[in-house]
Amino acid sequence: MTELIDIPFLLTKDCSADLEDRLRFCIETGSLYQTHESFKKDIGEIVNTRQALVNLKFGDSKLLTKYYGYLECLLKKIDPEALAFSWSYTNYTIFEGNVFRDENLLGERRNILFNLGIAYYQSAKHIDDYKNNLPLVCDYLKRSAGCFEILSQRTKERNSEKAIISETMLKALKSMCMGLAQETVWFKSLAAKKDLLTSKLAYKCFEYFQESLNSFQLVGQSTEYIKLILVFVESKMLYFKAVCVYRLAQSIESIADNVGVVIRCLSIAVAALTNSKLESTVVFKNKCLEMLRQLEKDNDFIYLKHVPSHLQFSDFVKLYKLDSMKDLIVLPDLTEIAPSMLDQILFRNLLPIEIMDYGTSYNEKQDIYVLQHFVEPINLLNIQLDEELASFFEIDPQHIVNAHNKTKSFVTRKELDVIGQSFGDLESNAINIETQLANITSYLDLEIKTYEEDKQQYGDVWTIVDARDVTKEFYEKVEKLRQYLEIGRNINLETQELFASIDKSLVTSRTSKAHLTAQYNDPFLNKIEALKKRRERFISEIEKKSYENRIISKLIMYYKETDDIPGTISEREEIFDNIYSKHMKVFAVDMKYIEDCKNENYGLIKEIEEYKSRTNFNNEDRSSDPRTQYIQDVRQSLASLDDVKTQLKKGTAYYQQLIEKVNELVQVIVGFLEARRNDRERLLNEISTAA
């Protein structure tokens, strides 16, 4: 299609060396237990393909399509800001200073899709036998328009993809390509020799080119290329304006009765063709001019009809319904534009660190769920029972105080000793964690020192990623864990101070718990004691169940199964949420136990109320009663002791989680150091062989 104007590609620089280094760094620092050596082939493939795109030509649409697919793979695995690519926009807009600008991974994808649109356009332009290849020409132009349409939508919808090439420019190019595609449909209709149909198809071409011209005029004549394209689009619009009215004139059956209308149509056609700069308009203009002059002469001497000079082009469009033609050009979607873009999946087995981040986030969410739906409700139910039992004891103080005012509680000196030892156990855990974190720091320091010594010895040939860069994230995690450790120690100190403030003589007895139970042998108290033990066992079991049922394996499985689906990990957050919702159904059966506990509490409280009624307890003020005051002191001490127990339990769980996180970090760093050691040995062998 030789009449098409040349539209240039966006220019880019060769960045293969920098791209390879950045990809290695991204894999080392942003993936899970993996090194760049495992993806050496994939890195080479994407670097070589990118290098081949520096000098583009019209037949490179397949190469662009392949590279576009590679970028889709990268966007699912790597932070878009981690990579940089140099691009020049001087053909489309005017810049001050440096011709080339850096773009991130999203900008790279955007520009590759833009160049793909240009490549399809250029493919249509270079088809010599236009008449016999109309479907192929039309397909290329639709694909080109489809690329610009996708870019236009992304530029409009995504603030993160603010493009140098504006949405208006993209709309202008899209409308131009659609007009050219419509032209192939119009051209094919000429063989049918149906002038009115041909006129309507020509008007559709006119509409597309008019839309394109309006958009280009909004862009402005910023560069020489834009000026040339603007002239081309305007000339095409004028050409099809002329074709439209010319074919309309041809469709009028009775020339003698409508010679004035025909003359007006030809006048509009000649005026439009006079301003068109297309070479093909010369012959057509002369033909229209010759017909116009002959009809004007015949009208002056034979027909003597009025020429409606007041009628404009838009009037003919309305009178003859030239705009009634539906859109015949349907743009393809991206999979049709670039059908082979996912033929080869790069970095298929690369697991982004974000997967682990999501897993950790969901684990924390799951822990909160277990705490809020199981642990806390049961604790609240137990507190409710304790409060009711307190009033139960006030009715009959002998349940707590004997004749000699000695405490008969269910806490022994041995139990208090165990509590005291627990503080030491927690501090031992803290010391162990502190030691592990110090060891991790030492390993990282040693790795940096080793790298610096190797770099100093071997110079530029030492191409292993800088240890100072790849260990930065590990140092940050160690510091975060130290902060968590300090928080735990502060809470332990506060709890220890609370324990020290408790009057041990009020909450301990000279006899064992078993002896007290035998002495009172209160079935009601025994019943409640057994119930609390069952609830404690349930909490232990539900916490164990939660620990053994983590979501990370399900996320990894889903990710591997759907690795060929386009899009970033963050775009799958809704799917991850659905996986989490299904995962949490494992606790659905346990919710019935909470309802059973609520019903148990209701029954026990009812029993206590009935007991109160039977005792005819006098509700007069007894605050001055020494026994009542003593009971209140006991209750306060016991409540403080319960707080200590609760905090110790939480502290144990807190340190357990902290130990798990430290162990996870140790595993990651061990894998990291192992990979670094392998890379070092490999590079030393290469240097030795080269020498």
From Swiss-Prot:
InterPro entries: ALIX_V_dom, BRO1_dom, BRO1_sf. It comes from the Eukaryota. GO terms for cellular component: endosome. Residues 3-385 form the BRO1 domain. It holds the Pfam family BRO1. Belongs to the palA/RIM20 family. This is pH-response regulator protein palA/RIM20. It comes from Candida glabrata (strain ATCC 2001 / BCRC 20586 / JCM 3761 / NBRC 0622 / NRRL Y-65 / CBS 138) (Yeast).
